[in-house]
């Protein structure tokens, strides 16, 4: 009887070890897949905002982390991805937050060229009302394309507002708060970039992705 119990115990132990190993392999395999998908999504967004042929570095692996609640809308670190050519600045894609959306925080990325012209804006995450505030999402409306090729200057700063507030950007019927929040966030991001461009491109690379280490 003792031999049978010992044998069964050994079998159960081996089974537990094998199961744990399979779970670990599945976990790490899943994590790698998640990271791969994240990198692919990131690269697709960067390609939309900065033409790949305009720079020669690995932009998705070249970034700095910054924190500016006043300008970037969050007290958590935000990524700034840097595009360079022959070591010279070409563009940057900056993560930003509009903290005052109608239904909460709106996460976005803003592409800015070397002279601080907006190359594009994409909303990454939001909880705005379907059929109203969700028009900030490019999948719903082309409203966000209105930022393309806009440049913030001292002379036109007052234009960086929705039309209801005397600016140039359309608001939505029945939903002014949402576009107002996004316009303000993009404007503040442009201001941050203009004030910190030199520091952004001279800082050490802080991107440490798994794919970069594997490559």
From Swiss-Prot:
GO terms for molecular function: electron transfer activity; FMN binding. The modification FMN phosphoryl threonine is found at residue 176. It is an enzyme of class 7 (translocase). GO terms for biological process: electron transport chain. It is a single-pass membrane protein. PANTHER family: ION-TRANSLOCATING OXIDOREDUCTASE COMPLEX SUBUNIT G. The complex is composed of six subunits: RnfA, RnfB, RnfC, RnfD, RnfE and RnfG. This is Ion-translocating oxidoreductase complex subunit G. It comes from Pseudoalteromonas atlantica (strain T6c / ATCC BAA-1087).
